[in-house]
Amino acid sequence: MFNDIGALELLTLGVLAVLVFGPDKLPKLIQDVTRTIRKIREFSDSAKEDIRSELGPQFKDFEFEDLNPKTFVRKQLMDGNDDLGLKEIRESFDLRKEISDVTDAVNGRTPAASDTANSAVNGSAGAAADGVTTSLTKTGETTPDLLKKAPQQAQPERPPFDADAT
């Protein structure tokens, strides 16, 4: 709860407490606050024990921290058993394959040609067995000239400016 309070903030709170309550009332106030916190903890612990005793022996491994929705979901999903098939879903969203498909599309290659080129580079005999050969040299008519400027299209007329409308 107070993990993000630094030394400077703690010192500032101490100085403010001395200024607000005064040095003569501060020790009594600290004792009252610590006594109240202890009573709250005792009440909480006794309530937890009462609930555990009323639930019976089948719930002896019950943890109240599991009632927090974040920890419940984290415990159920990150546990070792994969009853819901989440591993298959994670594998179906393989981003490496999608990124390679996008880069192939940007480079102007089809995904089948890139798969054949990748298998030929990796030394796989699957491409040679199919009888499909892929040339890895560039040909002038198939690759677009990216350095050439695209012809500019005629821009449509702008609508008239209406000063009263703005």
Swiss-Prot record:
Membrane disposition: Single-pass membrane protein
Biased composition (Polar residues): 132-142
Gene3D superfamilies the record matches: 1.20.5.3310
Family matches, as InterPro entries: TatA/B/E (IPR003369), TatB (IPR018448)
Subcellular location, record wording: Cell membrane
Biased composition regions of type Low complexity, renumbered to the chain: 117-129
Primary localisation category: membrane
GO terms for biological process, alphabetical: protein transport by the Tat complex
Record keywords: Cell membrane, Membrane, Protein transport, Translocation, Transmembrane, Transmembrane helix, Transport
GO molecular function annotations of the record: protein transmembrane transporter activity
Keyword Transport: yes
Region of interest: Disordered: 110-166
GO cellular component: TAT protein transport complex
Membrane-traversing stretches: 2-22
Family of this protein: Belongs to the TatB family.
Subunit-level organization: The Tat system comprises two distinct complexes: a TatABC complex, containing multiple copies of TatA, TatB and TatC subunits, and a separate TatA complex, containing only TatA subunits. Substrates initially bind to the TatABC complex, which probably triggers association of the separate TatA complex to form the active translocon.
Function: Part of the twin-arginine translocation (Tat) system that transports large folded proteins containing a characteristic twin-arginine motif in their signal peptide across membranes. Together with TatC, TatB is part of a receptor directly interacting with Tat signal peptides. TatB may form an oligomeric binding site that transiently accommodates folded Tat precursor proteins before their translocation.
Entries under HAMAP family matching the protein: TatB
Record protein name field: Sec-independent protein translocase protein TatB
Gene: tatB
